[in-house]
């Protein structure tokens, strides 16, 4: 389990950091 490279969690199914997605829900990860 590697740590996603985005410093945020999913919020209402979205990630607001550019280039990040909710693919590692509940954490955001690089697309």
UniProtKB/Swiss-Prot annotation:
InterPro entries: Cyclotide (IPR005535), Cyclotide_sf (IPR036146). This is Cycloviolacin-O14. It comes from Viola odorata (Sweet violet). Probably participates in a plant defense mechanism. Has hemolytic activity. This is a cyclic peptide. Keywords: Cytolysis, Disulfide bond, Hemolysis, Knottin, Plant defense. SUPFAM superfamilies: Cyclotides (SSF57038). Expressed in leaves and petioles but not in petals, roots and runners (at protein level). GO terms for biological process: defense response; killing of cells of another organism. The presence of a 'disulfide through disulfide knot' structurally defines this protein as a knottin. Disulfide bonds join 6-20, 10-22, 15-28. Belongs to the cyclotide family. Moebius subfamily. The lineage of its organism: Eukaryota, Viridiplantae, Streptophyta, Embryophyta, Tracheophyta. It comes from the Eukaryota.
């Amino acid at each position: 389990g590697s740590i996603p490279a985005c410093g945020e969690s999913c919020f209402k199914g979205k990630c607001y950091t550019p280039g990040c997605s909710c693919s590692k829900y509940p954490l955001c990860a690089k697309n």
